[in-house]
Amino acid sequence: MRRSAFTALLRREIRMMNREPAYLLNGPFTMLLLPLIYGMMYLSGSLRLPPETAELMQGNAGIVIAGAVGAFIGSTSGVAATAVSRDAKNLRLIKSLPLPMKRFMQAKLAHAMLFAGTGACIGVGGSAFLFSLTPLHAAGSLMIALSLALFCNLLALMLDTVHPKLHWDTPTAAVKHNLNTVIMFF
């Protein structure tokens, strides 16, 4: 079965992320670790929220807040902020292929959005569970989270395109010593 160039590039991005533990543990693992910590705090009873919080979350502000939580968790993976830097050793090969650079960037953005979508679902799902949001409010929050995550990932990809970390000795350095990830956290 013949695949499109975009699908092949997206599969390449996914394989590269899964093949290198440093990429996976220093990036997408963060979006799993944060909700896990908050979940443990909630279950242990150490996460105490004022009673007014539940009331606030039932209104329209709850949709925006849950969406912002989902967007934050979805954007913490750093996949887009290190997309070009992780390919630094292969840039000459990539430039020599008869494909427009637009396709490479679209695949990198789609890869980042796969993780952002997962993180947004985790963040909005956790907020919906914690504050008993209605399905309609949760769906609205998810749309907000995905929109904000797309915006953040576009900014991160542009930042890494303009200022990539091209010289690194180990794959870990491409992710851990990259200031683009820290900049995108803020």
Go through each PLM region and give its residues:
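Hydrophobic alpha-helical transmembrane segments of membrane proteins
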Residues: 1-92, 100-186
